Amino acid sequence: MPTRRGCSGPCHFLASAFVLLLLPALNQSVVLPSTVPRAVQESKPLEPGPRTLSPLPPGPTAAQPRGQAQSEGAGPRGAESRNGSIPGAASEADGPEGKAGESSLGGSLAVSPNPSDKPMTQRALTVLVVVSAAVLVYFVVRTVRMRRRNRKTRRYGVLDTNIENMELTPLEQDDEDDDNTLFDANHPRR
């Protein structure tokens, strides 16, 4: 059987996990203009360097789904802040131009304008799912290979067993009568 070159199973596993952890850092500098929302694109140009998210205000917007939070941020939230039903929301929703602009979209939502900027928990979950899938594939391949090896063993039967590993020494025979064995195969009782 030829020897395998390169890394073994755990080495491939660790290497792929390391690459997955580095991918978000490598892709952070690449920004596709089609993925950035138009409001953010018009209000300020993209600056090179690390991007950070603004802190989330306390409230129900952090737990809402993405689509629901965006629709409420554009519609009823702006109306509530102008009516004065939520204190402090008017200063948060009004931008420098006096209208609900980028700050209401970016400040109240837990959504980054750049989809490649994922939260740490989402990255960890992605890595966990990929690693679990890799482990699952490894064990499935291992099981298939073991079955192929077992089929060959069944085909040849006794000839394929390792006789070197088997002990073929004769059993010790005691001539004493206080033996506790039920029967002796060499001298069956009649």
Swiss-Prot record:
Bilayer topology: Single-pass type I membrane protein
Keyword Membrane appears in the UniProt entry: yes
InterPro entries referenced in this protein's UniProt entry, alphabetically: FAM174-like
Any matching Pfam family: DUF1180
Superkingdom, taxonomy of origin: Eukaryota
Topology feature Cytoplasmic, residues: 145-190
Extent of the signal sequence: 1-29
Stretches that traverse the bilayer: 124-144
Family: Belongs to the FAM174 family.
UniProt protein name: Membrane protein FAM174A
